[in-house]
Design a protein with these regions (language model features):
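Conserved glycine-rich cofactor-binding loop
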Residues: 14-16
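Conserved glycine-rich Rossmann-like NAD(P)H-binding loop of the short-chain dehydrogenase/reductase
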Residues: 30-44
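The beta1-alpha1 cofactor-binding region of Rossmann-like NAD(H)/NADP(H)-dependent oxidoreductases
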Residues: 40, 60-72, 104
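Substrate-binding pocket helix/loop in short-chain dehydrogenase/reductase
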Residues: 97-99, 106-108
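Active-site helix of classical SDR
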Residues: 122, 160
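Residue(s) in the substrate-gating loop at a strand-loop-helix junction
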Residues: 144
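C-terminal helical subdomain
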Residues: 184-185, 203-249
């Protein structure tokens, strides 16, 4: 295996931020494992990477299912032999629901994807990075602006993103002995299909509705590549990237 070969895995790689990051990582020289539940969008991402002469592997998995995640990372280990970077990106929106109207099943569903899924994928990547030679690697967790300042009526989403920060810092501490770095990128208003509603208006801190500025998702993808390509002696523990005009600073 050439010493210069680099391997990455991206969860939620079939659309949005995950797709953009996977394509950018491939352009930066990484061979990329594309992880997601549905094969068709993953194959579309692989085709995009292939058109730019990149290499990718499609890995179908449900990040909220422990057995599925373990099988996915076993497939990655078998195909690549090692893993240098995990972009732990998969997550779901939860809309705006007043606390008194929250159903326990809805809460559990958000937690399963946004928190348990992050834990399961980080655990599998950590095991792989600890066992491989040379030892080490980097885990980049997708946090959110909501890891610092919540939007109204988003208690489940905000709670899971705050918890991701705890996962990031714990792995950054525990991984030191094994040359495993852990980072978090907190993203605000990247232009994807999930944020199209921002053009029409989203709830503000005072309860009013207003449109919000968005930024091109390629800026996020390029930021992920920058974090991923650092030597393991350096780590960006936290990065916040946001649309310049979005109401974040002071919104709480």
């Amino acid at each position: 295996m050439p010493a210069s070969k680099k391997y990455a895995a991206v969860t939620g790689a079939g659309s949005g931020i995950g797709q953009a990051a996977a394509v950018a990582l491939a352009k930066a020289g990484f061979t990329v494992a594309l992880i997601g539940r549905r094969a068709e969008p993953l194959l579309e991402t692989k085709e995009t990477i292939g058109r730019a002469d990149g290499e990718a592997l499609v890995v179908q998995a449900d990040v909220a299912n422990a057995a599925s995640v373990e099988q996915a990372f076993a497939k990655i280990a078998d195909a690549f032999g090692r893993l240098d970077v995990l972009f732990n990106n998969a997550g779901r929106n939860a809309g705006a629901v007043p606390l008194e109207d929250y159903e326990v099943d809805f809460w559990n569903d958000v937690v399963a994807t946004n928190l348990t899924g992050v834990f399961l994928c980080a655990r599998s990547a950590y095991r792989l990075m600890k066992a491989q030679t040379p030892q080490g690697g980097r885990i980049i967790n997708n946090g959110s602006i909501s890891a610092h300042s919540p939007r109204p009526h988003t208690i489940a989403y905000s709670a899971t993103k705050h918890a991701v920060t705890g996962i990031t810092r714990s792995i950054a501490l525990d991984g030191r002995a094994f040359n495993i770095a852990c980072s978090q990128i907190d993203i605000g208003n990247a232009a994807t299909s999930l944020t199209e509603r921002m053009n029409r208006g989203v709830m503000q801190a005072d309860g009013s509705m207003a449109p919000e500025a968005r930024m091109d998702v390629t800026h996020v993808a390029n930021a992920v590549v920058h974090m991923a390509d650092l030597p393991l002696e350096a780590n960006i523990l936290n990065m916040t990237i946001m649309a310049t005009a979005m109401p974040f600073v002071g919104r709480g």
